[in-house]
């Protein structure tokens, strides 16, 4: 009985991944892979295949810990939270994709126009950060993978 209680307590205190990441809800300088986001806040989830979820998680934690610009705040189960430069980065690893949320700590003014090629109004710094992270880990946005399969 005592062993069962100790096990229950240990499981209750073990780090838990959230079921999902919170939405940007119109915040400036925030992107998310939540499909309900407005287009200027949406970025496709990242696929980590052919890696397993455990390997993808280990690689991501290692990369973020080794990056001098990042401080890992939480790495529970399949969830990672880090402060990278001026952004809070959250990664939630599902079976075959990584969902994410990247939000600036200090919100800036989002201009109502773009001056860069392929710009989507707002949150370009956060888009570049998550795409660079994915590239370094060998992950790709699921929409680019799907488009490549159709070509």
Would you name each region that the model predicts?
Residues 13-151:
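Ser/Thr-rich, low-complexity intrinsically disordered terminal regions
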Residues 1, 8-12:
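N-terminal chloroplast transit peptides
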Residues 3-5, 119:
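Generic alpha-helix initiation/capping and coil-helix boundary signal
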